[in-house]
C-alpha cells in the first residue's frame, strides 16, 4: 500500500522539455509504479512554446507567473490561484513564464500509447 507523500518542487530533478527562444522544464513527482492512475509534477516555463496533442486528461494549476495555453483558436492566460482543465486529444501550445503544477490521468499514458 502506498503512503502519503509530501513533495517539494525544490527536491525534484527537472528535465528540459522546450528550448529557444525560451526554456521549459518538467519534473515528474510520482512515477507510474507509485500511481499508474495519476501522474503529477511541476513545470517551469521560461518563454518556451511547446506544441503537443495531449494523450491524457490534464489539470494545470499556477503557483507563480502566467502560464499560457493556446487551443482551438483560443489563448488562455492562467495565473496564481487559477487552474485549467485540458481534455485528452486537445491539440495545443504551452507557453508563458510560470511555475505550475500538473495532474494527468492516466498516469501511465506513455505505456498505454507505446511511448
PLM regions with names:
Residues 33-54, 87:
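Conserved short histidine dyad/triad with adjacent acidic residue
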Residues 88-112:
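Ligand-binding loop in jelly-roll beta-barrel domains
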Residues 44-45, 53-69:
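Short, conserved beta-strand element in jelly-roll/cupin
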Residues 73-89:
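Short acidic-glycine-tyrosine-enriched beta hairpin
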Residues 1-42:
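A short, N-terminal "cap"/entry segment at the start of jelly-roll beta-barrel domains
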Residues 59, 66-68, 75, 91, ...:
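Structural motif
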Amino acid at each position: 500500500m502506498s503512503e502519503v507523500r509530501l513533495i517539494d518542487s525544490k527536491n525534484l530533478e527537472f528535465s528540459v522539455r522546450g528550448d529557444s527562444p525560451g526554456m521549459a522544464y518538467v519534473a515528474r513527482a510520482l512515477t507510474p509504479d507509485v500511481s499508474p492512475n495519476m501522474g503529477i509534477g511541476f513545470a517551469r516555463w521560461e518563454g518556451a512554446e511547446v506544441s503537443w496533442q495531449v494523450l491524457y486528461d490534464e489539470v494545470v494549476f499556477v503557483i507563480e507567473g502566467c502560464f499560457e495555453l493556446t487551443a482551438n483558436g483560443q489563448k488562455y492566460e492562467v495565473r496564481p490561484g487559477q487552474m485549467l482543465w485540458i481534455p485528452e486529444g486537445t491539440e495545443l501550445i504551452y507557453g508563458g513564464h510560470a511555475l505550475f503544477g500538473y495532474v494527468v490521468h492516466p498516469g501511465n499514458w506513455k505505456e498505454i500509447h507505446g511511448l
